[in-house]
């Protein structure tokens, strides 16, 4: 659409995650937002707490390559903390102290999260339309299950997930 989105940070705290998978999902979201002419409102941050130099050097190189390939020099940022105090919550708190004032909203992705651009736009619109909301939590959904047990969980999630999510939302 032609709506103007509020400034939003999409942050992905990572710690020794499979780099190509984690950043591949972020790349896909960035490209989809750009296709919908909505990329200007959204900045992406990879917030690394990785300790292994081999891993964080791959993270940094992958982010640099993505920035160049996507023309995202002012939209995609990589930051690695030298001291990973308080784990993931400390990583996000550090981001908020340093850069949080630049944005009206923040969307936190896990390294294995897959969100469409449409979903991100919808989340921003929800936050914009509900200023009293402090947190909007999506209902997680399993995807690409491989083991028999995981496929059973995925099936149950498809059958009951929406009902469970609606019930949980109603009591909050």
Which residues fall in each region the model found?
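Cell-envelope/extracellular polymer assembly enzymes that use nucleotide-activated donors
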Residues: 7-11, 43
């Amino acid at each position: 659409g032609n709506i103007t989105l509020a400034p939003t940070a999409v942050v992905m705290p990572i710690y020794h995650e499979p780099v190509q998978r984690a950043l591949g999902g972020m790349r896909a979201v960035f490209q989809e937002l750009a296709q919908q002419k909505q990329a200007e409102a959204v900045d992406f941050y990879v917030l690394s707490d990785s300790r292994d130099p081999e891993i964080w050097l791959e993270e940094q190189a992958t982010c640099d390559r993505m920035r160049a390939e996507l023309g995202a020099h002012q939209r995609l940022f990589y930051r690695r903390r030298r001291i990973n105090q308080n784990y993931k919550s400390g990583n996000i708190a550090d981001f908020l102290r340093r850069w949080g004032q630049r944005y009206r909203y923040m969307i936190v992705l896990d390294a294995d999260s897959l969100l469409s651009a449409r979903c991100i736009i919808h989340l921003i619109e929800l936050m914009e339309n509900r200023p009293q909301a402090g947190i909007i939590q999506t209902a997680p959904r399993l995807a690409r299950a491989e083991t028999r047990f995981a496929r059973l969980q995925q099936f149950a999630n498809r059958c009951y997930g929406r009902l469970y999510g609606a019930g949980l939302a109603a009591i909050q």
